């Protein structure tokens, strides 16, 4: 392994990054296919259900992205140990991470229960609340299972095995789409449940994926030793504190980014059902870019954590910049067909002509913020790979809460630009976040390299 990783004389690491990143992207693309399928099926069932799903999905995205961010604290720990060839210590870290993730999942579940009883106080259309409430409760059941899946996935990612999670996610999403078809429309003996049916199918697939991942780690020969180490290890105060020290800053950083979109969704809801439905379609389309960029960014974190274990800081920098360049190219490749067919995209999700017109305009704004999005994902994950996560919280707060959200509100309402104004703020916040993350990454890696030289 050391010979394979230790190659600082290389000029670029595109092939190695792609070999790790492509399975992550493919697995995550299964999620976007699922999102498209959900939105397509719900939108053609009832437009009101599409708007209700948009609100609930945005709220849960905030929670699930934060939860995923917390689990990300495991990756640099596992990656560093893997790079140092100390694989016997990995099992204990995974067990402590699982315990920490369960505690955090319970906290998130309690917070969502409190929010459920206050759904009528956030200014949403009254006609949507009867659809929102049951869909909200059904999704609530799946939170803890998402935490189990995340822990297993971050462990496997840390040891550079990204294909298992890819196949599990693809399988789970196929099951989900089939379940949607049966339960939204009431095929055969199944009842026509509409939006509630989509929620039941999604929750069921999340539970199934968590159980499969646990089974793979415990019973598959390749991972059996890790599974034994996880089972026989114990919860320790130091490891538990380490998981929280690395997990919470990433969770908060991702939460603030997601909150900017979620609170923007709430503001769009003030404009009415039609803009909210268009916003939901745009969030679904933009997830295609998000999952591709974040998948490659995850590969950046994995590769960097391995080289940190070897103290090869030249390779650390090269992997970060090579990953960023790949993300720029991926954004361009994805963006060209989306822009060319922007007038047809809305029609895939709904027959409402007014919603389709909104979507065709918002697609242009979505493409504008792809540069900033690629920059901030790449260097946020580069910071995660070197386990420098605390500064990310401050930078995210400045970019999203001090700049992006107030700007979106000002342009949308006092300036009268409505949903266009709200969306104009996204590229500004994302680009500022990316610049701050990149600057901090360079500073920290230079410091690590200087310490290595001083101690040589």
Predicted regions mapped to residue ranges:
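Transmembrane helical elements of multi-pass membrane transporters/channels
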Residues: 19-38, 138, 172, 205-209, ...
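Helix-terminus/linker motif at the lipid-water interface of multi-pass membrane proteins
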Residues: 29, 33-51, 119-126, 182-193, ...
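Short runs within selected transmembrane alpha-helices of multi-pass transporters and secretion channels
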Residues: 71, 75, 139-157, 165-173, ...
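Small-residue hotspots at the loop-to-helix junctions and early N-terminal turns
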Residues: 47-58, 132, 136, 199, ...
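Short alpha-helical transmembrane segments in multi-pass integral membrane proteins
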Residues: 1-21, 78-144, 190-247, 304-369, ...
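Hydrophobic residues within alpha-helical transmembrane segments
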Residues: 22, 26, 56-59, 99, ...
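Small-residue-rich hydrophobic transmembrane alpha-helices
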Residues: 50-113, 146-165, 265, 278-342, ...
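N-terminal transmembrane alpha-helices
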Residues: 8-40, 44-45, 61-73, 77, ...
């Amino acid at each position: 392994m050391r010979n394979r990783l230790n190659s600082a004389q290389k000029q670029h690491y595109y092939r190695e990054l792609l070999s790790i990143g492509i399975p992550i992207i493919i697995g995550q693309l299964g999620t976007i296919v699922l999102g498209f399928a959900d939105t397509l099926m719900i939108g053609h069932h009832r437009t009101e259900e599409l708007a209700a799903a948009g609100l609930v999905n945005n709220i849960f995205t905030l929670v699930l992205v934060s939860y995923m961010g917390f689990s990300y604290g495991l990756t640099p720990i596992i990656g560093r140990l893997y790079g140092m060839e100390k694989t016997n210590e990995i099992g204990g870290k995974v067990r402590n991470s699982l315990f920490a993730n369960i505690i955090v999942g319970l906290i998130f579940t309690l917070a969502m229960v409190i929010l459920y009883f206050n759904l009528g106080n956030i200014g949403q259309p009254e006609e949507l609340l009867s659809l929102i409430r049951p869909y909200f409760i059904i999704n609530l059941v799946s939170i803890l299972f998402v935490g189990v899946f995340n822990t297993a996935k971050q462990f496997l990612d840390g040891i550079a095995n990204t294909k298992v999670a890819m196949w599990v996610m693809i399988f789970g999403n196929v099951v989900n789409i089939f379940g949607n078809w049966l339960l939204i429309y009431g095929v055969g003996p199944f009842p026509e449940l509409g939006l509630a049916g989509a929620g039941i199918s999604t929750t069921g697939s999340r539970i199934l994926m968590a159980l499969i991942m646990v089974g793979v780690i415990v019973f598959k020969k390749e991972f059996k030793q890790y599974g034994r180490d996880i089972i026989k290890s114990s919860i320790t105060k130091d490891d538990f504190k380490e998981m929280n020290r690395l997990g919470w800053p990433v969770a908060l950083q991702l939460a603030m980014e997601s909150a900017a979109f979620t609170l923007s969704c709430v503001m769009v809801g003030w404009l009415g059902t039609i803009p909210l439905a268009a916003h939901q379609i745009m969030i679904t389309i933009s997830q295609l870019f998000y999952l591709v960029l974040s998948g490659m960014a995850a590969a950046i974190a994995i590769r960097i954590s391995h080289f940190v274990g070897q103290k090869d800081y030249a390779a650390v920098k090269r992997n970060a910049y090579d990953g960023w360049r790949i993300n720029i190219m991926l954004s361009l490749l994805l963006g060209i067909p989306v822009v060319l067919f922007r007038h047809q995209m809305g029609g895939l999700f709904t027959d409402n002509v007014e919603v389709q017109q909104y979507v065709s305009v918002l697609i242009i704004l979505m493409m504008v913020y792809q540069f900033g999005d690629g920059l901030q994902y790449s260097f946020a994950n580069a910071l995660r790979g070197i386990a420098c996560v605390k500064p990310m919280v401050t930078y995210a707060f400045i970019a999203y809460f001090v700049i992006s959200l107030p700007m979106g509100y000002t342009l949308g309402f006092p300036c009268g630009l409505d949903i266009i104004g709200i969306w104009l703020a996204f590229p500004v916040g994302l680009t500022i976040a990316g610049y701050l993350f990149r600057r901090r990454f360079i500073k920290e890696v230079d410091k690590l390299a200087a310490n290595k030289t001083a101690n040589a």
